[in-house]
Amino acid sequence: MKFIIIFVIIIFNANTVSAAEFLIYLESAYKSNPFLNASRENYKAIKENINISRSEFLPTVFITGSQSSQQNSNRTNKVGTTLPDNSNNSEKKSISVDQKIFQGFQGYNLIKKSKLETDQATLELKNTEQQVLLQSATAYYDLVYKIKNVQFNLLNVDLFERQVESDSSRLQKGEITLTDLAQSESSLAGANAKFIAAKTELLTAKSNFERIIRLPAPEKIIKDNSIKTISLNLPTGLNSAFIFSEKNNPKLLLAKLDYKISEKNVDIEKSKFSPSASINYTQSQNKDFSSSVDEADQETLKATVTIPLFKGGKNYSSLKKKKFRKAQSNLILQDIINEVKTDTANSWSVYKSSSSILKATQAQVKAAEIANEGITLEYDSGNTRTTLEVIQSRSLLLNARISNAKAERDFAVSKFKLLAVVGKLTLENLKKS
């Protein structure tokens, strides 16, 4: 029994993961996750909309040039007289400058909309970063839990193997019956089945870890100190969580920007009812080597004013459509405000309850270890303890350890979920802590 206790102590103090190593895993996902990198490229693309909108205020310059050559042969006049061959050669060069003067503030509103869309892309990137970091932390702590699950089940198999050996010897001495040995053998078979299932779950957890974090999954993480050594700067109370989420929750901020963009879309549609003005300057040079005028230069300055009168009702319908979209965005915003409040309350509740559950499972493990050690010693000393009582105590100990490992996993993940819902789950914040 002393050997087993020493073995457990050695296992649970090996392969300790520090906060620095944990951050390495998160940083790998932050840099290498394909979904996050795709969001970064989307941000770069959306950012170019500002330059595209600004181009509406700048002149457009065209340079054109053409050259033609025409050869005429086998010519005759009306009476059939043959005419000499001739050729026509011409060149034309021109430069044209177009400048929009007024578009009913359409260009101004397009720039404003582009800036809002860039802010929106920034928030979408932040939201994606939070999702990837949360997925990475969840994958990591899930891997820790599944590795512990395998180790606990392996230790359980080892204990039952020793019990079967001990019971076989005691059966030969007549201390127990064949039924007692059969109970031990059945428990060993059940322990092996659970061990195989735990290994299968571990393979799935490793695969998920490598998919999200983009690094090989560690083979052993028995003791994890990351959640204890990282200060996540969580809200101190539910009211504090509400304040943070209202200011920083990306989902809520995105909904607010969606509404502002819908307002700009209405303004852009309204500008299409306004008159527009533009000016054009063209300078051209023509050369015709076959005509009486060899060369001619021409300059043209043209001002154009366009007043929209009727377009088959298209403008009115487009404006109505944008107004309906604006109303839709406002309704969605109100719903998301309530949704974020609910998510914040739920995340806070899960965080507090998981903390209580963790403390309860720690007490459960401590009590189960004491009970199992006492029952096993009494059984080995030939006391009145039965084989079934030993099996039950070991099953209770295994379940207590697995429940505690799961509670540790749930508590750690609940912290990151709460940090995400208040909009503070960033790699920079984690490194500062």
Name every feature range the model reports, one short phrase each.
Residues 90-92, 138, 183, 298-300:
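Transmembrane beta-barrel architecture of outer-membrane proteins
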Residues 3-13:
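Sec-dependent N-terminal signal peptides
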Residues 26, 94-96, 140, 242, ...:
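Membrane-embedded beta-strand positions in outer-membrane beta-barrel channels/transporters
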Residues 37, 60-87, 98-127, 253, ...:
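Small/polar (Gly/Ser/Thr/Ala-rich) solvent-exposed segments
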Residues 18-64, 72, 217, 221-260, ...:
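Bacterial Sec-pathway N-terminal export signals of envelope proteins
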Residues 112-115, 178-189, 320, 387-395:
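Short, charged, amphipathic alpha-helical segments
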Residues 24, 131-244, 347-350, 354:
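Periplasmic alpha-helical coiled-coil/stalk elements that build and connect Gram-negative outer-membrane
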Residues 38-53, 128, 132-151, 162, ...:
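Amphipathic alpha-helical coiled-coil segments
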